[in-house]
Amino acid sequence: MNAIEIKNLTKNFGQKQALCGLNMTVPVGSIYGFIGENGSGKSTTEKILCGLIHPSSGNVKIFDKEHTNIDVRSKMGCLIEMPGCFKNYSVWNNLMLQAVNLNIQNPEEEVRKVLKLVRMEGAASNKFKNCSLGMKQRIGIAMALLGNPNLLILDEPINGLDVDGMRIMREIMIDLTTNHNCTIVVSSHVLGELEKVATHYGIIRQGKMIKEMAAEELEQSCRTYVAVKAKEINKTKGVLSCKYNKVVEDENEYIRIYDIVTPEEIVTYLYNNDILVNEVKTDKISLEEYYIDLMNEKGGK
């Protein structure tokens, strides 16, 4: 059984088709990185999963039940946008109000539990308006965790956060899936951060799923390149470009060679052209680079 199974999902807004036969499978216990450019259909899919909008057609099952099933809905938590909180209320009072509205038994105990999960026990008395962006995002996750959900839908939870905020968010997601029987679907444009936590990926383009894979498959799919660093960057790049098909300079002043070649061959070739190499290494392309390659292959950005 999977946490989510979507088949042939469509959604129309007037004449505009936002989802065009989307298929999606999210394994139980995974952190599923949901990736796509703006307007690709990510948010529409997440809103359908959360019951905020209805699909035009297709089948959506959550834990093998229809996504509209009341038992399913009670075991889901969603953070689709900045949480709607009373700005002059404390963090504690905002969460208590939500817990009472959800008819949660022992609301005080539940609020204490979710505050601990999102690393905010010490900020319970803070007014919402005085909280940082990262804290507000964590308050939203705390609200979504009320009721002990098995599935969490997070739309762009790390965008705009500083380094420490992103680290805390990563730790929270890993803790929830590892220790609290939770499956997470998380969308983000910060692919470098997503790559650090995701166990599975789904890449969507123009309302269709173009690739789903486990993190292990991504690791195997990412092509290897050789990177060299030499004193004369432009000369090095020019010499390498005369022999190899794809040679690029990265942001760290390494020259990358994507052809199938060994580091020893590169060093020897440059030495024969009077260029001494300061450093040479092999590496694999990142999730972001893989995504860009895939979009180019499919005719996207």
Q: Model-found features: residue ranges?
A:
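ABC-family P-loop ATPase nucleotide-binding domain
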Residues: 1-10, 297-301
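ABC transporter nucleotide-binding domain
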Residues: 170-258
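Surface-exposed charge patches
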Residues: 97, 113, 238, 268, ...
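Residue-level detector of short coil/turn "hinge" positions at structural boundaries
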Residues: 106, 122, 247, 271, ...
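C-terminal coupling/interaction segments
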Residues: 258-301
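Residue-level "edge-of-site" marker
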Residues: 128, 252, 283
